[in-house]
Regions:
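Conserved N-terminal beta1-alpha1 strand-loop-helix module at the mouth
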Residues: 1-64, 68-70, 85-87
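Active-site regions of enzymes building and remodeling cell-envelope glycoconjugates
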Residues: 14, 33-34, 104-107, 154
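Short, acidic/polar
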Residues: 17-29, 72-79, 117-125
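Structural recognition of alpha->loop->beta junctions
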Residues: 29, 78-90, 124-135
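Short catalytic-loop micro-motif centered on adjacent basic/acidic residues
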Residues: 36-37, 109, 133-136
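Active-site-adjacent beta->alpha loops and helix N-cap segments on the catalytic face
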Residues: 40-56, 69-74, 91-105, 114-124, ...
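Hydrophobic "anchor" residues on beta-strands that sit immediately upstream
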Residues: 59, 106, 131
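Short, conserved beta-strand edge motifs with alternating hydrophobic and charged residues
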Residues: 63, 90-92, 108-110
């Protein structure tokens, strides 16, 4: 798989996460934003939302778990691949990451790192899931993220 997504994030690690059309319009007009995380929409609007991002020359990543009318099953990823121009997905579901990778889509596996069990879960799952990136929430955890980066080879 091409490294376009990884290179875009490396070049500019600020990623726009949009929750509504107003935020989408604003980030599409900013030249320093290369990647857009789409955190809203439904099955009727997602193709148009993605099209706006692509017309602005940006990488479109859809948070599958937040799109109205989509299940959190592999068929949802196939729907997005076949009906939108999305470059990839964001999800909390390892099975959806696997499916997206099969379809040559970029992947971000989102974890909520709330305790040591969740931490161990990240370490064990990343060997079988192989996302392009891991997103760790809550975001204000620099010490834990630094420790995690020392233990795994996937960009965090």
């Amino acid at each position: 798989m091409e490294r376009i997504f990884w290179e875009a994030v490396e070049e500019n690690p600020i990623i726009a996460a949009v929750k509504n059309m107003e935020d989408l319009e604003k980030c599409c007009s900013l030249s320093d934003i290369h990647v857009v995380f789409i955190l809203f929409g439904d099955i009727c609007s997602i193709a148009d939302i993605v099209q706006k991002v692509k017309e602005a020359g940006k990488i479109a990543m859809i948070h599958v778990d937040l799109i109205g009318g989509l299940s959190t099953r592999e068929i949802a990823v196939e729907f997005l691949k076949n009906n939108t121009e999305a470059d990839g997905i964001i999800t909390t579901k390892p099975a959806l990451v696997r499916k997206a990778r099969e379809l040559s889509m970029y992947t971000v596996l989102r974890y909520f790192l709330l305790d040591s069990m969740a931490y161990e879960n990240i370490l064990s799952q990343q060997h079988s899931v192989h996302p392009d990136f891991i997103e760790v929430l809550p975001g204000a955890m620099p010490k834990v993220i630094h420790r995690l980066c020392a233990e795994i080879k996937v960009p965090v």
